[in-house]
């Protein structure tokens, strides 16, 4: 290997630098989204942790998802805000590696956790008599722990191998964070093995959980149509359809980015697609899964009444 094969020590994240006249507006938009995301998800964590009525397996997974979303969005958005505010878009090689690891870690964990949540809903609706056995506290801990372990394995399975490859220039990443595909395009050596690894991991971590989710909700919908009450069917169908829209948005956009070879990465459109699973879904998840829930709203009301003694 020649002396200059790994000469790149930092990268330049282009992000939305081409929208020079909109930097201030973009900063305000992303700051608002980030603050709402953190506040909404943190609220869910606090409510589930403190309210005795929210101690079922469903809320255990919702609390885990909310904590996950705070970390997930914090990997990318604060750095994006810094770039928009200062105009300095450089990131060190080690910083890029850390960002990639944690993004993969949180993203893979969410892929597995959403499948566990779908299984929880299936068990609650389709197997109500066996639900306490199927989703015991021990089983919930095992499912959540397996999801977190999966995230660690994915992060460690990709990041060290990619950043052990030679980067000899250019160092410009047409993205607002260090995502695998655009980073791989900067590698000087052969990346065919890495690309195959990404495709296999994508099939395992996106297609398989998404298939399990669709299967679970398919069984749930069959059960829903057997509900005699029209109002009950409508309410259950509304909840399931909103959940399916969310998981389809998350898995679909991630699949679009990661299932393709690096040569097909489009710097004009792919960063916009990445926004959906990196920025949009973390703010929508607490709304779709929790804040529309009557039990969560009742818990919020009780918490406010305890904090501020007054008539609500």
From Swiss-Prot:
Q: Which residues are glycosylated?
A: 4
Any single biological process term in GO: detection of chemical stimulus involved in sensory perception of smell
Q: Which residues lie on this side of the membrane: Extracellular?
A: 1-24, 75-98, 160-196, 258-270
**Highest taxon of source:** Eukaryota
**Keywords for the protein's UniProt record, in alphabetical order:** Cell membrane, Disulfide bond, G-protein coupled receptor, Glycoprotein, Membrane, Olfaction, Receptor, Sensory transduction, Transducer, Transmembrane, Transmembrane helix
Q: Which cysteines are joined by disulfide bonds?
A: 96-188
Query: Which InterPro entries does this entry report, sorted A to Z?
Result: GPCR_Rhodpsn (IPR000276), GPCR_Rhodpsn_7TM (IPR017452), Olfact_rcpt (IPR000725)
Q: Which family does it belong to?
A: Belongs to the G-protein coupled receptor 1 family.
Say what the protein does.
Odorant receptor.
What name does the UniProt record give this protein?
Olfactory receptor 10C1
């Amino acid at each position: 290997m020649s002396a200059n094969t790994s000469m790149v020590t930092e990268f330049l994240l282009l992000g939305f630098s081409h929208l020079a006249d909109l930097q201030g507006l973009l900063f305000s938009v992303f700051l608002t989204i980030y603050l709402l995301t953190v506040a909404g998800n943190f609220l869910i964590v606090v409510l589930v942790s403190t309210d005795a009525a929210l101690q079922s397996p469903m809320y255990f997974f919702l609390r885990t998802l909310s904590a996950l979303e705070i970390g997930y969005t914090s990997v990318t958005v604060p750095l994006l805000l810094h770039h928009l505010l200062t105009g300095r878009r450089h990131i060190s090689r080690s910083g890029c590696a850390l960002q990639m690891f944690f993004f993969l870690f949180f993203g893979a964990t969410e892929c597995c956790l959403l499948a566990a949540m779908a299984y929880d809903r299936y068990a609650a609706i389709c197997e109500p008599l066996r639900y306490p056995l199927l989703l015991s506290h021990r089983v919930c801990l095992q499912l959540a722990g397996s999801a977190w372990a999966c995230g660690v394995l994915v992060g460690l399975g990709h990041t060290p191998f990619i950043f052990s490859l030679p980067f000899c220039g250019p160092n410009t990443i047409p993205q607002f964070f260090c995502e695998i595909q655009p980073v791989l395009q900067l590698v000087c050596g052969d990346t065919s093995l890495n690309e195959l690894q990404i495709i296999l991991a994508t099939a395992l971590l996106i297609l398989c959980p998404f298939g399990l989710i669709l299967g679970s909700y398919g069984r749930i919908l069959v059960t829903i149509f057997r509900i005699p009450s029209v109002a009950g069917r409508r309410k259950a169908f509304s909840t399931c359809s909103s959940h399916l829209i969310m998981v389809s948005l998350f898995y679909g956009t991630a699949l679009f980015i990661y299932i393709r070879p690096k040569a097909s990465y489009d710097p004009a459109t792919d960063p916009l697609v990445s926004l959906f699973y990196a920025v949009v879904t973390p703010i929508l998840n607490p709304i779709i899964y929790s804040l529309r829930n009557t039990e969560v709203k009742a818990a919020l009301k009780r918490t406010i009444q305890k904090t501020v003694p007054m008539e609500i």
